[in-house]
Regions:
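A short, conserved acidic/glycine-rich loop-to-beta-strand motif
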Residues: 129-153
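Surface-exposed cleft-lining segments at the edges of enzyme active sites
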Residues: 79-85
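GT-A fold catalytic core of metal-dependent nucleotide-sugar glycosyltransferases
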Residues: 88-134
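Short glycine- and hydrophobic/aromatic-rich loop-to-beta-strand nucleating segment
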Residues: 157-165
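Short His-Asn-centered micro-motif
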Residues: 7-12, 45-47, 91, 111-113, ...
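Soluble or luminal CAZymes and related metallo-dependent hydrolases
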Residues: 23-27, 88-92, 185-186
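Catalytic core and acceptor-binding pocket of nucleotide-sugar-dependent glycosyltransferases
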Residues: 168-193
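N-terminal anchoring/stem segment of glycosyltransferases
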Residues: 1-77, 101, 164-165
Length: 193
């Protein structure tokens, strides 16, 4: 029997533009139900509007930490997304790290709230060989990029694996990038246009 790896979902309605005036989207129910078909532990860090949708629901605000507050203070939205949405992309990593540390988990899989999971992540052997795994399209290999334009490379964390240590290092990296490397972030914005 393998060690249980929790599947983590973060979904707060907040001011998200895609909510179209609704408090929650129906797809979240399907995301949770599908993940539970294959996985023993599925956790939702959510808000009062989705409390009934997952047996292992936790109020996301209970996992706000000093580390998140530090990141939030230096965060600058460089995307075309509304700021609340862009912050949420990063916020989940900080909240999930706190959940893992409080509950003594050594690893997790994080999925977006609109992902349908057809895998028992606890039995997926390739995760045993890394600290972090995320979807990166093959045709975006660094060697295939235009010279001097490495910022076009991107990775999607909509289905990602982290050890707790890997998530600590990633959130430290996020704080450092926004606090101390404005030059790189300015180049990101220029390349992204």
């Amino acid at each position: 029997m393998s060690k249980i790896i929790p599947v983590m979902v973060h979904h707060e309605t907040g001011e998200k533009a895609q909510a179209a005036g609704k408090k929650n989207q129906e797809y979240l129910k399907y995301c949770i139900a599908q993940a539970k078909k294959y996985n023993e532990k599925v956790v939702l860090l959510g808000d009062e509007y989705n409390k009934a949708w997952c047996d292992d629901w936790h109020n996301a605000n209970d996992f706000i930490t000093e580390k998140w507050t530090k990141f939030h203070a230096v965060f600058e939205n460089l995307s075309t997304y509304p700021t609340a949405w862009a912050e949420g992309i990063f916020k989940r990593f900080f909240l999930i790290l706190e959940y893992l540390e409080r509950n003594s988990f050594e690893e997790c899989v994080i999925i977006d709230s609109d992902v349908l999971l057809y895998l028992n992540v606890s039995e997926y052997e390739p995760f045993r060989h890394c600290k972090v795994a995320a979807e990166t399209p093959l045709l975006q290999d660094f060697a295939m990029l235009e010279k001097g334009n490495g910022l076009k490379w991107k990775t999607c964390a909509g289905f990602s694996y982290f050890t707790t240590q890997g998530l600590r290092e990633f959130t430290d990296f996020c704080i450092d990038m926004y606090a101390n490397h404005k030059d790189v972030r300015s180049e990101e914005r220029r390349v992204g246009k």
